[in-house]
Amino acid sequence: MAEVESPLKLSGAPPPPEGVGGGHCSEISTELIRSLTELQELEAVYERLCGEEKAVEKELDALLEQQNTIESKMVTLHRMGPSLQLIEGDAKQLAGMITFTCSLAENVSSKVRQLDLAKNRLYQAIQRADDILDLKFCMDGVQTALRNEDYEQAAAHIHRYLCLDKSVIELSRQGKEGSMIDANLKLLQEAEQRLKAIVAEKFAIATKEGDLPQVERFFKIFPLLGLHEDGLSKFSEYLCKQVASKAEENLLLVLGSDMSDRRAAVIFADTLTLLFEGIARIVETHQPIVETYYGPGRLFTLIKYLQVECDTQVEKVVNKFIKQRDYHQQFRLVQSNLMRNSATEKIEPRELDPVLTEVTLMNARSELYLRFLRKRISADFEVGDSMASEEVKQEHQKCLDKLLNNCLLSCTMQELIGFYITMEEYFMRETVNKAVALDTYEKGQLTSSMVDDVFYIVKKCIGRALSSSNIDCLCAMINLATRELEADFRDVLCNKLRMGFPATTLQDIQRGVTSAVNIMHSSLQQGKFDTKGIESTDEAKLSFLVTLNNVEVCSENISTLKKTLESDCTKLFSQGIGGEQAQAKFDSCLSDLAAVSNKFRDLLQEGLAELNSSAVKPQVQPWINTFLSVSHSIEEEEFNDYEANDPWVQQFILNLEQQMAEFKASLSPVIYDSLTGLMTSLVAVELEKVVLKSTFNRLGGLQFDKELRSLIAYLTTVTTWTIRDKFARLSQMATILNLERVTEILDYWGANSGPLTWRLTPAEVRQVLALRIDFRNEDIKRLRL
């Protein structure tokens, strides 16, 4: 029997994939089928063929379904045939035109390149010829100019020679005329060296004789000879001698001046001002010359030399200032006095006043001068660096910062300001202490003298620091003033308020004695004790009220000072003084100052609370308690009698008015209004307590409503505080006490409340309803609130 595949292998072969077109033939050949003899093998082959038949049928069905689409596409393709033939012809024609154009362009561009090459060679030839002619012209011209002593013209010829292209000259030397060119070059080089020597000699003679026109004449020639640095160096040396001569002359005038002169107190500041103005005039005068003849970016070199001389002269002036004003000696005395438990004799603050003013003026003039230099150099660099890289610009900025920040002028002023801050601190502290010690009160005034005196001193010290134009100095003084106001001055006011308002009842007397003992104990611990004796009650009351006014004015003055400083420093920052870091430091100092204002407000609230509890509450409570002695379970006759002869509220209002009138004359409007607000809160709380202890009938509730309305109407006229909100609970209690029946409350409660917000809880509503003697408890308990 022929060898055939096993049925398992045949049956395990994968069927052809469905839906795949393309005439797949069966893998089972006719010969294979004929060779099969077993039934099982025949069945396996049969199943395989059936599967292939089904796949072919599916593929055929899919092709038949696409027949219409394919036929329509074929029709479309037949129609497109003529058009495609036309397009093919046009495309061939276009390709031919492009090929022709490309060839033509290539021919033209090659000829243009040849023309460019010829033109460049022609230009080079012309340049070479021009340079040879220029060389000959320069050689002839410089000889003639030197003979005629026309040094400007000679320098112009040398400058023209120096600008010639050296490579062209080198090529010319290799040509036929090389020997002639070498001769011309040698003559020009000799003329160059000769002219340099002449210019240097003439410039030296002019500077020695002080002939400014001649100095400027030869100064302009240096850059034509390529001697930029040499020219700037020599010219700067001449200018520095001028500066030194004038500065020494001014210093001699200072040392010989009359100390009674009007400007004697600031004579050293004036001397520095003259020095700075002289240098500024030199820069303004010669900047156009430097820019024109030396080019932009060269002004920095000139100013660098001038600043060295400026530092030398500043050092001389400052040394004379320190010696003549005893600046260091005064600083040492101040430093010793600032130390606790120091036995050094105290220096009088007013002796420091003129010295401190002069130091800040000196620093202000220095800052103005340095800002002038920064502005001029930056503008010059900006023009010169217009095409430079970012690295070059940054390097120039570093050089500028180094020059101005590290110069001796800046360091010296920084040292003087460091001493100034310590001395100004001493001046402020001592004068503030003196103002507190000499505190007086004039009748009719709301505040005592020390408030105006202290803030005059603080403003003067901060203003003086501000006038220095040094942000670090200003911030230091703001911090010192903040500390002085917060610690020392606030403690003075705080101790006065802690003495309390004079007591009027036995309980208040006991509290006042305890407070006084605490203050005395605190004073003894600090080594200070006031031996003036115990003031009378009226004086103590007035002292307490004046202190309250002082605290309120201090808070307002600090806020005003903060706003003023913000405005003044905005102008400083707009002038370019300081930067973002200085702005942040200044803002931080102002925040600390504002915090002190808030602490004074807190102290004021503590004082008001003490006044309210000591003076208002002991009086108001008994007046409110008389409400309990007035019956509110009344008949029609009594109700009418109450209307004619009010039993409580009118007298209560009169008592309040009389009591508050005493405070109104002695307190500032702001404090009086705050005290009135505390009083109204007290009245609302205490009245609610006595109402809950009373009983009412319908007419009594109506009477209470009238009394409450009268009281609210009066209190509304005496304060700007919101009264109705404080009396909202009492008003709702009056509404409840006016109800005709218990269930009427439901017309005002819950969903029926409308815009009304109930301040009373359901339990409190039931408590108020229970005050009505004509309401039954059973009805009240049945309410669903």
Curated annotation (Swiss-Prot):
Region (Interaction with SCFD1): 2-84
Major localization class: cytoplasm
Modification sites for N-acetylalanine: A2
InterPro entries: COG4, COG4_C, COG4_M, COG4_N
Stretches the record annotates as E domain: 741-785
UniProt region (Interaction with STX5), positions on chain: 85-153
Role played: Required for normal Golgi function. Plays a role in SNARE-pin assembly and Golgi-to-ER retrograde transport via its interaction with SCFD1.
Family, similarity comment: Belongs to the COG4 family.
Record protein name field: Conserved oligomeric Golgi complex subunit 4
Organism: Mus musculus (Mouse)
Biological classification of the source: Eukaryota, Metazoa, Chordata, Craniata, Vertebrata
